[in-house]
Amino acid sequence: GLASLLGKALKAGLKIGTHFLGGAPQQ
């Protein structure tokens, strides 16, 4: 349903966010 889709998107977003925060150099 919509809730599980939202949960998946949120988890994916968090994964991408932490990847960018941890992997990309801050300028």
Curated annotation (Swiss-Prot):
Superkingdom of origin organism: Eukaryota
TM region(s), chain numbering: none
Compartments, as annotated in UniProt: Secreted
Main subcellular location: secreted
Tissue and organ expression note: Expressed by the skin glands.
GO cellular component labels: extracellular region
Keywords of the record: Amphibian defense peptide, Antimicrobial, Secreted
GO biological process: defense response
Keyword field contains Secreted: yes
Entry's family note: Belongs to the gastrin/cholecystokinin family.
Chain's role: Antimicrobial peptide.
Record-given protein name: Caerulein precursor fragment R3
Organism: Xenopus ruwenzoriensis (Uganda clawed frog)
